[in-house]
């Protein structure tokens, strides 16, 4: 078996949510190619890690403003049927996040994010499931794995949840007629 791996940082210029200031956000990407025989087509996987904010599971949703956020990282691994761009995967993840992560925030942006984090609930389980559903309905993606790593900044904990497409797991993928 021959394995070749290549990792690199990928930057996207984004606008902050309120002040519309430009900032660069870094995402870690990698390609992994594996082949077991010379006549076999290599298996190529692409992965990207996207930082987001999700709701801390111990938050008190019944108290006004009682929700807390946690830093989460979504790691996507995909095997593609055809070209797909890292920006598309980042957009997919951030669309389902409670709040995306920015490298720069003004005080107006911080206030907006804090208010959203304390008033809206979006668990890492919900985010992972929504991303899985999007990937399962994306015809360019042959196989996927979604992992959500969660880090408690005040409570000093870390957790991980994940799912992947499997022919043995019902509803982890959809037939091409359904896409």
Predicted regions and their residues:
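N-terminal intrinsically disordered, cationic/polar leader segments
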Residues: 1-179
